């Protein structure tokens, strides 16, 4: 394998790893509440079973990492790449904060406010990524769709409780 392939492979693994790390940090706050607080609160009829969320989020974090890699490999010397990846890191932080607020603090209302910021951060990431790599932007489509659904669930849980 030549140097460039090794370098790109390391970037891909790093980008996915950083993205998954955000999910792991969020899960530290999520897991203790899934079988206690979250199991007891009222949820909307279309709320998926708890076991669905782990595989969905693991997949979405991997897709985020692939998208970030497609942007990163264009080169950090480019201003648009730096901006796009900075926005990306910001949305990862918002993503992690949602788990802390919703599951850690048991605050559906606070999490509802936060998920609005997350949604706009994802939209900003998609726009910034599209300027660098259209495929990277499209790879994030399932993510913003899922967060839109999660926002509906969050709102419903807030109303029901």
Model features per residue range: what roles?
Residues 2-29:
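N-terminal signal-anchor transmembrane alpha helix
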Residues 3-7, 72-82, 130-137:
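Membrane-interface helix-boundary motifs at transmembrane edges
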Residues 32-46, 160:
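Membrane-interface helix termini and inter-helical loops of multi-pass transporters
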Residues 48-63, 106-118:
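Membrane-interface loop-to-helix entry segments
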Residues 62-99:
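Helix-adjacent hinge/juxtasegments
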Residues 85-94, 111-125, 143-147:
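Hydrophobic alpha-helical segments of small multi-pass membrane proteins
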Residues 102-108, 124-137:
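Membrane-helix boundary connector in multi-pass membrane proteins
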Residues 151-161:
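Juxtamembrane boundary at the C-terminal end of a transmembrane helix
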């Amino acid at each position: 394998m030549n140097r460039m392939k090794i370098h790109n492979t390391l970037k891909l693994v790093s980008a996915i790893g950083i993205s998954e790390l955000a999910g792991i940090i969020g899960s530290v706050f999520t897991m203790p509440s899934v079988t206690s607080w979250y199991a007891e609160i009222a949820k909307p009829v279309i709320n998926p079973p708890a076991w669905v969320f782990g595989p969905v989020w693991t997949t979405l974090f991997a897709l985020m990492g692939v998208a970030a890699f497609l942007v990163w490999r264009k080169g950090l010397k480019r201003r648009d790449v730096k901006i796009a990846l900075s926005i990306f890191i910001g949305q990862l932080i918002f993503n992690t904060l949602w788990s802390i607020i919703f599951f850690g603090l048991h605050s559906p209302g606070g999490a509802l406010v936060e998920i609005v910021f997350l949604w706009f951060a994802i939209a900003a990431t998609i726009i910034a990524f599209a300027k660098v790599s259209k495929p990277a932007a499209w790879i994030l489509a399932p993510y913003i769709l899922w967060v839109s659904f999660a926002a509906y669930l969050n709102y419903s849980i807030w109303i029901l409780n």
